[in-house]
């Protein structure tokens, strides 16, 4: 016993004794009163009362938004929102709500699934001054409708997904669906009508929300809470619970419970992040969702908390529990892992009246301390009578958190909300009384015996109970049961705890006919139900599932002989609970069997689930096969547990599976064993043939991709879809390639590139290439480094044009991205280009989501990748699918819509029409819009073709395959299947549509067989797969795409040339007619792409009108017969008559079938020759057909054959003595035609290749044959091109497709002659050319510091590189740079040294030393090099910076001879744990572009993460010397013809020649459109020179990157590619300033391709300038790149960078350096010149500023002269 309790009881004992001494005539009740001392103690606990907080919670949220607008406020499964966004969106929506209804006391229901938009809706209602009522769409419609009727809703906010439900439950209200598109449409700045209202201040006394709870009359009761009431509790409560700005708070609670309001408002008011998982993950994978969202704080019931995995608890800062009691064992267990908080609070007094902020602190559980209130305990029968301390009493809550009462229910309000109770007015001896309002909770509690005043929960007083966290009014259940049972039935709902263990269970006790008393004569309290009553119970149960939530449905109906009653004639509930405690779980199931038919569990899965049910629900495993999980005590929580338990037993279930299939038998049918794909990963190279060695696969793949072998990560087969797409794109080059563009602020674009880099590393499909492996076919190769990025400083339209012309084919990247400046603005265009072979419409949003999450620093992992899907396809047994499609397509009629103009016609879509079909919002159908469209189109086709058997193709998502996480796999899975519909005009429309829906579901397991495989199954399948119409049901473009969201920039990508993704899909049309239907909320947009030779534009317009009419008829009259709407008007009928083939009877009704003409009959009866008999037998075996289905007139292609089957046919035929070739098979109209051989040398080469590819003899190929006549296809065309190039013939796939004959193809080929040998630009020593022998490794090796070094390459240095080498070798060594990498925290020194040496090993230029041989400076690449690495301790007391700089000075003065390494590292360590790595490097080895990559590599090497790849500098040298310079010489000759160097030399003599500089920033925010920033300083400098020197032709220098010369992966070249090149401006007298800018920009773009030539090379080879007098530029313009100042260095180490150039480069010229500032709105100009000329420089800088002003908008159109 606690000391306080002992003292209290002694005082109480003394008080009793004292009273007894005074007189013994006191009633016993007198001693139940609280003593004066105890009353004083109670008042001390409750004084002072917290004052009311007079502000609104949304004001706090607004303050947070103003402070941190860019911070993530909501991180939800459906997207993120920043504080700035929720503030903006809620403001706009609030104004709209005011415009719609500004009356007082408005109550607005809110109906959302878990979503980021819920908080926006709630805040908007708060700001508008209205009151919200949160609803959960999972609740029954009857309950939702009862709530809505009470609030008399005129406006209803819902999500788009719940808008239909909202309309049903509130038919009189205005439904406002909330989504991103809602804000875009209504609040767009381009919308004519804008909400024009202001938001009035909201009084704290106004109602904030209404919380509906279970009602005793059967109707939910709504408790009203004002702003101040909520805030008065929320603010102190949040502080105790643990909401902080860094918190990531789980949004778990259902919207039906008020805890969710705290989750939203407390989180946002404290600047934290609300993490909202989807409802599916919330129920099925809570631990996974919390892990992915990095949740730090979660609130839930203890029952749910028990399902969390251990690592989740370990990573939580706090977990708040409420809704039900917390066991001490749970509290102690969880308290060892995280801080456990317990909350209590009835809805009538806000969410939490008490908070125990450390549950594990005591060996028992208290309700915690008061928050915003006072707590009193009274006699349950008399609220004015307080009970003594330690006694059990009803909990009363007083204070500013007590609500206003119940909506429209004054009697109930008066019953439990008490104004000025007597005990409160009276006070105590030490505390004066006060006025106040209390709420009677009905909860029985007592105060903690340790004297701190904390209450301890004991039980409930009334019929309101809590079961597994859900608050239940038993009377509401009884009310709803009684409605459906005979009037003389007695019943009582109760929560019992059956004997034998297990959790509490809701049951109903029933007496079939009213009887009073207790026992039957035999002493048994239990009765029985008649058959008629059992039927009534079954019907009632069905209705309960409609009217009540599942947790309010009794788990069992217990029959009683009589209902136990109290003396007061009330039901004796205590006795009922005693009876309930005497029954077992088996008894409950036995009672239930009385109202359900018993069926034994028999199957293996039923028995397994039966055992799992027993573990979860208690008792023995004797469940019936038709027992209902929820009737047996299950609920949503147990469903979650069952999912996890089943997974542990190797069974796959989901919560929806359980919800939709609650009986044991139906659940067992839905359950399936865990597949191998779900339990194992797919190792690299595990899906290639066993006879293909992994090393050989790597080498072959690397060769075909043109990459290093080490870059190959995996190889596996292509899907049939990928094979077809990559092949067809070779025929139509840009048809299957999409470009998308996002225009973004420059800084955001650069960050987005980094996010893409991260996303690409995590998404193998983006790094995938497709190759053709000789003899094996097509494979996809995943590279470690996809080499996908490029940057251009050009106009975006030009970039798109060039990018479109860069093919995506075999061996090349199928996904790439680039940055393009937006001329005249601070924006950049981010362009992505992607081939359909690596994406589809489903997967691209997943890629963008991955990019957005990377952009925001969130996790990007996904459970599965494309290779898991490939493994699934490989594992499939096609027999089931073959049987399904064979039966499904049996008897298909060949004549389909639209008909072809003639047999063999190749369709080519050339026309496009759009038609919008409006679907009335009042039209409700149980079937999806997709099913209605399928059915309507089948009827349209039938009307036009005149028969009832319709086939068309539909492209599906393909994501119904049983691959775990398939919905999150990035990659193309779309598949096309033939949809066959047979119409019966006498059937009802609803039945017809239901049949189509059922067919769609049935085909799901078979949809990946592939059209090419389906068409081989039979003659009918071939007919069916000759598809004329393709249907794509395209979901509306993600509402977030195309909108500027700085937190999710990947959502802003739009198709480069088309406004919508649906239109983009039309580019992929290979049908006579393709219908892309974009499904929207109120209808669908049909885009029809068609061949006008098959159907005219006018006729197609009428077809779409018929489709529109039929859709409306289906929706309006679903019970009508199909024939009632199968009507064409006269003009439409005339169109149909003209389209129908002659062999379809024109006067037939839809029941008629086509007949074969006499020709086909004769052919089928023709006697077969012996050879034809042999061929038919072989074909039947190869194609899996009956021989009787094969006629002599059939061609192999018509029978469904392909190139592989053709080779099998040739092989088998030759074995039987038939001399057949693949060419004969494909070319002929029958199977016996022959072909002749080709002629001439080129044709002979091609014929030889074709014979190998097509498996035919050369002699069977003639020059007049076309590739496709010979049996070639798109895949074969790519193989032909690849093999031809290997034979020295350069042809393209386009040429293969365009050539009508082999002769034409041969004549178009470019043959590489011996005089034009193919050059391997990667070969070592090749850049030395004819001097390679002179500068041999043996000779050059003599110059090396260590003659034991192994030389792998030698190249001539570039001009600037040579100067840098001299500036390193010779004093003062101005080309040496020292990079200081400063670590503030301790670093692993050994690991750092290893990272530095590995850095050198990875980068060729770092292990390059420089020598001078015969006057030529050479770069000598070593196979390996250990560079100097030293450690130096900074002495105690020394200034670290000064000590390090002294060390650098000493180092730079030491000799750096030719032949030695210029690279060195020195780690300076400090006694405080900090350190500084000094990295020495020469400008001969780097430029400013590549150095940041070096530091990224060093960081990755230290951290052990993926290291960015770089391109060796020698590759750049080879490309420049062998390829670029020869092309550049003519360009520079032409540009500089007749020019001379412009000289700007003041008359001031130079004496000291020291450098000086002057700097100023200029506003360029008004630069003209389509002009790059880089054009401005160049144009301005040209103007200054022209005006200062009175010249119209000026030449000066520019510093360029040297990386735009066409070399692959130029941005990853590691080495000094930079160059000084000449820039010439020959002014025209007619120019405006804008003309000058365009001229400069054009020269920039043109010169970029030739910028690799050095200045001395240009002077020598391209000008008539005197090399002696013109040794350098007089003036140079330089736009400085950005530099990294700090970056993470791995393992939590942060690095800061400082650069030291101990000696400045000698000044040779005027420098005009430009720096982009303020996001491109300003340009900093620095003029560097000699000290003596600095005064002159001030004037020059002023003139530059004036020139820039002339180049801005407003003056750019003025004439220069």
Curated annotation (Swiss-Prot):
Lineage top rank: taxon: Eukaryota
Phenotypic effect of disruption: Leads to increased sensitivity to oxidative stress and to iron depletion. Reduces the virulence toward maize plantst. Causes a defect in colonization in planta, but not in prepenetration growth or in penetration.
Short name of any one Pfam family annotated for the protein: Condensation
GO MF term list: ligase activity; phosphopantetheine binding
Induction note: Expression is up-regulated under iron depletion. Expression is repressed by the transcription repressor SRE1 under iron replete conditions.
Keywords recorded for this protein, A-Z: Ligase, Multifunctional enzyme, Phosphopantetheine, Phosphoprotein
UniProt-annotated stretches for the region Adenylation: 63-468
GO process terms (BP): amino acid activation for nonribosomal peptide biosynthetic process; secondary metabolite biosynthetic process
GO cellular component, one term: cytoplasm
CDD domains: A_NRPS_SidN3_like, CT_NRPS-like, FUM14_C_NRPS-like
Residues annotated as domain Carrier: 600-675, 1169-1242, 1237-1313
EC number assigned by the record: 6.3.2.-
Residues annotated with O-(pantetheine 4'-phosphoryl)serine modification: 636, 1203, 1274
Residue numbers spanned by region Condensation 2: 1354-1677
Family statement: Belongs to the NRP synthetase family.
Described function: Nonribosomal peptide synthetase; part of the gene cluster that mediates the biosynthesis of hydroxamate-containing siderophores that play a critical role in virulence. Cochliobolus heterostrophus produces extracellular coprogen-type siderophores including coprogen, neocoprogen I and neocoprogen II, as well as the intracellular siderophore ferricrocin. The role of extracellular siderophores is to supply iron to the fungus during plant infection, and the intracellular ferricrocin is required for intracellular iron distribution and storage with a crucial role in ascus and ascospore development.
Record's comment describing the protein's domains: NRP synthetases are composed of discrete domains (adenylation (A), thiolation (T) or peptidyl carrier protein (PCP) and condensation (C) domains) which when grouped together are referred to as a single module. Each module is responsible for the recognition (via the A domain) and incorporation of a single amino acid into the growing peptide product. Thus, an NRP synthetase is generally composed of one or more modules and can terminate in a thioesterase domain (TE) that releases the newly synthesized peptide from the enzyme.
Protein name: Nonribosomal peptide synthetase 6
Source organism of the structure: Cochliobolus heterostrophus (strain C4 / ATCC 48331 / race T) (Southern corn leaf blight fungus)
